[in-house]
Amino acid sequence: MNQKQSKPNVILIVVDQMRADALSINRSDDLVVTPTMDMMASMGYNFENAYSPVPSCVPARAALLTGMDQEKSGRVGYEDEVPWNYTNTLPQTFKDLGYQTECIGKMHVYPNRKRMGFDHVLLHDGYLHVDRKYNKAYGETFEHSSDYLDWIKQELGSDADIIDDGANCNSWDVRPFELPEKYHPTNWIVSESIRFLKRRDPSVPFFLKMSFEKPHAPLNPPKYFYDLYMDKLGDVSDLHIGNWEELEEKIPSLYAKRGKIPADAQKRMLAAYYGLITHIDNQLSRFLTAVEEFDLLENTIFWFVSDHGDQLGEHYLFRKGYPYQGSIKIPAFIFDPGNLIAGTKKSVTQLVKIQDVFPSLVELATGEKVETDGKSVRQLLFGEFAGWRNEFHGEHSLGEDSSQYILTDEWKFIWFPVKDEYQLFHMTEDPEEKCNLIAETKYTSLVNEFKAKLARILQEREEGFVRDGQLCQVPLEHIVSTLKRGR
């Protein structure tokens, strides 16, 4: 340990749109290749039931950086260009505690260059439609709000682009990366993170957020990693189809949120998605080697987390924003190679939320306790479960598919307020959510309990979810209007 530095360094590794079962250690088969992540999770503390309650980029990242639940942050769904006016943030807290704070990669805040408490940000938010609109301010356009794209143009010329192949930020279509691998955004984030290790102030601890924009589309892994899964993947027809899905007969567009695509397209999509994850894993190995070479490994606490998951065609759904496990369940683990935490519980099965990252990292690294809606997981790492949550409320504004849900250790209850429809899944017996039990009379009492509980949670919401103590159908325009407001 550096003699001038008493507190450990903290590295928060964030990936975008990686579902929990895309981490090999969370699977029962050997399809996904993530040896570096598996090593980190198995040597550290793996959270087997980690969730993103509002599963899309903007609300999930607000929860991560502020520790706030959606009712307080105002982020109940995805909406661009709503100002981030939060002052109590994870990087600001570390900064106040004497840390040098750095973010490399994706922020997805507004304004784009708002630092949220970081001393310095090297920004690449990925391919965002909103940044490519014709009426964007000069400094907020895609060409001028990405440090990665600036670097690409410096390396390859002013006409260089990474999206001229037609791949889209929300498409299930696949285009293996056409440039040499060193120009891939995943490599750039790791290269710049290694450069940060070189230029940091060695007299103070650092908090580094390495924020990858992958495996979020465009689905453009380097060809090596794409080919790996085209060879490994067999039958891809099992899409966890249950007794409740409605399949639209029309052929889905490349940007569709639902529908059934041909089996060969499904295979290419999965090969590219898993290929992007294995590529990240490969680059994380490179980064950990650098951390060790700088003699920082045993004085650094790492936390790996995804902002949300991806449906990947399950239940005929794509992308995220849904109340199902593909969207809301995420990989999360702590890697503590120096055994600084010295916990005793390596596999944690309790319900953990993305809001818990903020208070957990601060307490684990500094001993300081901060007040947020999230909770520090320290007690769980020592096998102390008293007072821990056994359920949580989640939601997402998504047009007619807008949802409210309650997840417990055993059950998931879902309400779609625009359609006024309900679902009930017995998660311990039906983890793939194939059998909707809402119509079975033996569960009527349980359903009524969930309805009453959800009505109490939503009683004061401006959308008008509750009338006379009962859940009531809500017009779509009531839900859309709330997305325009931040807190």
Annotate the PLM regions.
Residues 298, 371, 420, 461-468:
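Short, polar/charged, Gly/Pro-enriched helix-capping and turn/loop motifs at alpha-helix termini
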Residues 428:
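Residues forming the ATP-binding cleft of Hanks-type serine/threonine protein kinase domains
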